[in-house]
Structure formats: C-alpha cells, structure tokens
Amino acid sequence: MIVPIQCEYYALEGLGQLVGNVDLVKANLNPDLEISKIVLVMYDSRTKISKQVADEVREYFGGRVCKQIIPRSVRLSEAPSYGQPITVFDPTSRGAIAYKELAREVLNE
C-alpha cells in the first residue's frame, strides 16, 4: 500500500489512525497488508510545519518514505477541475515533474 500524506499537522494524526487500522486488518483479514511507501504531498518549503511533518514521518517510517516529495502547486490543484491529470494539464509544471520522478522511484525499487 502506498500512502500519501499531506505535510500538515492533522494529516499526522490521520496517519496514526491509518496505521492502527492497518494493524487491525492485518490481524483479522489480511496478514500480508503492509504500508510499503509513504509519499509526502502538498509540501510547502516556505512553512515550518511542512518540514516538521516530513521530519517526523521520516523518523517513524524511515526508508519507507519516498525521497521524491510532491510540492504544493497551484497547477496541481487546478488540473482536476479540468478533468485532466497534471501530466496532461501542464506536463512541464513542478508538480508533473515531481509525479514523474516519484513514478520512476517507485518502479525502480
């Protein structure tokens, strides 16, 4: 399972709840279920909270956190309203490039 997490405070709480739910599912339904990757999304390098969340997630999950971070981007938020993926809507945007790099990272592991 690949889990995206927004680099916001409440997302950390949600991630904690998700880990608990994954443990319940593993114990009762699917012992093979694992969080294989965590993707940091909506990262804003101008804010302290983004860095703090990224640091805490990396500290807890270690190597399961993808190196490629998806930045906060106006173009990324606009693409769905046009019914298009970012790679079609604006293929040269920072967000599109970040998602392409993330795909390469995940596929190469």
Report residues per predicted region.
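Short, charged/polar low-complexity linear motifs in solvent-exposed/disordered segments
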Residues: N30, G95, E105-V106
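Conserved catalytic-core segment of NTP-binding enzymes
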Residues: M1-V74
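C-terminal boundary of histidine-terminating zinc-finger modules
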Residues: A79-E101
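C-terminal alpha-helix
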Residues: E101-E109
